């Protein structure tokens, strides 16, 4: 089983399939959309088969490993593998992208180009989670941005060029830090290598780690996103189509969280111990600032975009908790938000197709004409506000308890952070339920409610939301369904991070001010 190049096949299948789209005879786009859906389903089936047949849940290290020399002159290798960090996100990518392809059914403008770019994104996103060569990681990270930019700039709204340009400038600017920090890691010391495992084993001075950590944090903070590097996201979501929404919220934001885990925590553990309080503070700012900003938004897309930023704050706090429970909760929050964010933004697209407005002031009373849509909006919003029995509740609870019980911070710091996290949790249902009240209940916009195009959701849309709600509820009632995949890897990562805390005080001779939030290690470090 392990001798077959599963990951390479999974990455290349949608990319190679995309190359055949230009020669498919198709005038109205119907053939090419069925072709793209078939490719997505086959690739997702391969992901599931490779997972069940060749992935050992008890093994924390890399599996399904492949390594082929690509450019021997610079020792660049096509090196891919999957562990507990990458496998859940590879599965999520296949699942969300396949549903996003179904969500793209209404696209009639240049359908061949659209589905061509969708398949390129599919392969590129999986590659980001699978590659184990840091230079190759940078290349696929950059190449994956091109389809996103084109989809935003061609199929977006009135300000699509502004949003697409802002997206590419932010992300490309951040990528420069990936390149500089990655090359520094590769060429530091006696051994020059791009292999991530070999880089993680290097003995890198703490001061250099701090500099590289800051560079990676800026780059991945753009994609997560982290305040104040977040401003591209509301603009991008404000102009994107439904399938682009699903990919942005469901997958692209997770690339930032994954990279923070893989590189900042995994490769630079000493620096992570110093930056951890900073991550906690940034996480709290994300939660509170974005929640208040979301509450003030009148544009439906921007309201949910800021909600996404708020939820990503829990990821940062979980990563900095130094506990198995907290970091596991951060990973679960990424997966949970991928599902919930995709469902909410799909509903935004479905609603806009009928109302042709995004302003909440103009949407009153549409629930009476969209009975099934009413139920779907309610279910997705309840999932987003972390209703017990849904995945968001479990993820946020794990982060809460994991951070509250962390022995890496003093009691005062933990108490303040937990209280502020609680404020964010309270704000979430306020702005989400008020959104539902304005949009679905009233006061009625008679012109809109009586419009002939305001029809209920169709079976295709019900199916897409149903597919997203099944894992949301399934994880909510049985979190082990997902946590068992990544817990061995997360536990190993946490132990590495915890062991690094005392080494900072001894090796870097940091001042008390720099470690004021971190107290000396106790038993278990």
Swiss-Prot record:
Reactions it catalyzes: a plastoquinone + NADH + (n+1) H(+)(in) = a plastoquinol + NAD(+) + n H(+)(out); a plastoquinone + NADPH + (n+1) H(+)(in) = a plastoquinol + NADP(+) + n H(+)(out)
A Pfam family matched in the record: Proton_antipo_M
Protein name: NAD(P)H-quinone oxidoreductase chain 4-1
UniProt source species: Synechocystis sp. (strain ATCC 27184 / PCC 6803 / Kazusa)
Recorded family membership: Belongs to the complex I subunit 4 family.
Gene Ontology CC annotation, any one: plasma membrane-derived thylakoid membrane
The keyword Translocase belongs to this UniProt entry's keyword annotation: yes
Location in or out of the cell: Cellular thylakoid membrane
Membrane-spanning residues: 4-24, 37-57, 89-109, 111-131, 134-154, 167-187, 210-230, 241-261, 273-293, 309-329, 330-350, 385-405, 416-436, 462-482
Recorded topology in the membrane: Multi-pass membrane protein
One biological process term in Gene Ontology: aerobic respiration
Keywords in alphabetical order: Membrane, NAD, NADP, Plastoquinone, Quinone, Thylakoid, Translocase, Transmembrane, Transmembrane helix
InterPro entries cross-referenced by the UniProt entry: NADH_Q_OxRdtase_chain4, NADH_Q_OxRdtase_chainM/4, NADH_UbQ_OxRdtase, ND/Mrp_TM
Gene of this entry: ndhD1
EC id: 7.1.1.-
Functional note: NDH-1 shuttles electrons from NAD(P)H, via FMN and iron-sulfur (Fe-S) centers, to quinones in the respiratory chain. The immediate electron acceptor for the enzyme in this species is believed to be plastoquinone. Couples the redox reaction to proton translocation (for every two electrons transferred, four hydrogen ions are translocated across the cytoplasmic membrane), and thus conserves the redox energy in a proton gradient.
MF GO annotations: NADH dehydrogenase (ubiquinone) activity; ubiquinone binding
Domain of life per record: Bacteria
